[in-house]
């Protein structure tokens, strides 16, 4: 089993458990250059809120879009947008990525901005 298939396997297992809970999910995806965050409805068919380093408004504030500072900016932005829509509680879906570095920075920034998970 290679690295990518192991990550997908972990993500599938976690998503199955989150689906059973029926909770709103904060989903994180990262690439070497960008990081993306989406708040997805409990049924899984609708993206309620999204933020990423691809967005011009966020990317203009950053020197580089693939580091922890960028992840923190995305976490803060997605939390603010979720709170505007009345979403306070979410379940954190790290998509099989290790809870470390950029993923952790995004989660910490979202918590500091007011999201609860």
From Swiss-Prot:
GO MF annotation list: 5S rRNA binding; structural constituent of ribosome
Keywords: Ribonucleoprotein, Ribosomal protein, RNA-binding, rRNA-binding
Gene: rplR
Ribosomal protein keyword on record: yes
Family as reported in the entry's similarity comment: Belongs to the universal ribosomal protein uL18 family.
Organism, as annotated: Cronobacter sakazakii (strain ATCC BAA-894) (Enterobacter sakazakii)
Record text on subunit structure and interactions: Part of the 50S ribosomal subunit; part of the 5S rRNA/L5/L18/L25 subcomplex. Contacts the 5S and 23S rRNAs.
Name under which the protein is recorded: Large ribosomal subunit protein uL18
Family matches, as Pfam families: Ribosomal_L18p
Function according to Swiss-Prot or TrEMBL: This is one of the proteins that bind and probably mediate the attachment of the 5S RNA into the large ribosomal subunit, where it forms part of the central protuberance.
UniProt-listed NCBIfam families: L18_bact
Record has RNA-binding as a keyword: yes
Domain of life: Bacteria
Entry-linked InterPro entries: Ribosomal_uL18_bac-type, Ribosomal_uL18_bac/euk
Any one of the GO CC terms: cytosolic large ribosomal subunit
HAMAP family linked: Ribosomal_uL18_B
């Amino acid at each position: 089993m290679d690295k990518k298939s192991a990550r997908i396997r972990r993500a599938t297992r976690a998503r199955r458990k989150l689906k059973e809970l029926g909770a709103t999910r904060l989903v994180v995806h990262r690439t070497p250059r960008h990081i993306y965050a989406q708040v997805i409805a409990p049924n899984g068919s609708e993206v309620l809120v999204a933020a990423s380093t691809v967005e011009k408004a966020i990317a203009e504030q950053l020197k580089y879009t693939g580091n922890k500072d960028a992840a923190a900016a995305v976490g803060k932005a997605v939390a603010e947008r979720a709170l505007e829509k009345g979403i306070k509680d979410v379940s954190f879906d790290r998509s099989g990525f290790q809870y470390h570095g950029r993923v952790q920075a995004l989660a910490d920034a979202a918590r500091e901005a007011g999201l609860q998970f």
